[in-house]
Amino acid sequence: MWFKNLLIYRLTQDLPFDAEALETALATKLARPCASQELTTYGFVAPFGKGEDAPLVHVSQDFMLVAARKEERILPGSVVRDAVKEKVEEIEAEQMRKVYKKERDQIKDEIIQAFLPRAFIRRSSTFAAIAPKQGLILVNSASPKRAEDLLSTLREVLGTLPVRPLTVKIAPTAIMTDWVKTQKAADDFFVLDECELRDTHEDGGIVRCKRQDLTGEEIQLHLSTGKVVTQLSLAWQDKLSFMLDDKMVVKRLKFEDLLQDQAEQDGGDEALGQQDASFTLMMLTFGDFLPALFEALGGEEIPQGI
């Protein structure tokens, strides 16, 4: 399993993460299908494997992997609006009276309840890696909302989960702008060919560059007029490439073939072995990559009082 995005959270207290206890806790809130009148459900699933015997916590070396699944019924807003409009017009025509907001809202609720059993089902899963020794939780998502859904549900079943988004001492925008402007990144990091530039003024312009030489005059001209880099494609060593944004979100992670080939060799012929090998190698790589990234961004910022 190779993460494609990364939201990084710092555990602010030492928690005794025990795989068996965590397994028991997650089992109290399993993922389940939506009932006929439910809009959404959320719960934990096995990250690898299927069936009742598949563990909810995958453990490899000092790392743990968990997964949560959201199931939701999709009701297009336009369908609901059209049905409400039709019903309101019918009432007003037949009863010769005006339908006001309170009654309109009631009609909308009734229509939603009537439509729910026939609505399409959408399922989505979110994975999180727990690294207790490093004090980190890494969520495979670029959406803070999806990450918070998982973390808050994990907090619910554990009773406590003191975490916060990891922050650095120097704003990523300042560092990325400097790297492009000076045409030199931190050690072991390499600027690639994609970036987003934004004007710092309110309602300022946005320039998105793709497959472009970021050392060229055009980019330097944008920087000289006050634009800053808010997204930048980078590579680290010869192991991975990614897009970093101004919110410290790592997107579009891609692990190089050398790592993937090694995981394939380590994992053997079974699917579970392949998944375990790739997860383990990914986490060991993160063990070197993330401290280097934090250092390149001025080091981790520890808020006062923590």
From Swiss-Prot:
GO terms for biological process: DNA recombination; regulation of DNA recombination. InterPro entries: RdgC (IPR007476). GO terms for cellular component: bacterial nucleoid; cytoplasm. Pfam families: RdgC (PF04381). Transmembrane segments: none annotated. Keywords: Cytoplasm, DNA recombination. Coiled coil: none annotated. It is found in: Cytoplasm, Nucleoid. GO terms for molecular function: double-stranded DNA binding. It comes from the Bacteria. Belongs to the RdgC family. May be involved in recombination. This is Recombination-associated protein RdgC. The gene is rdgC.
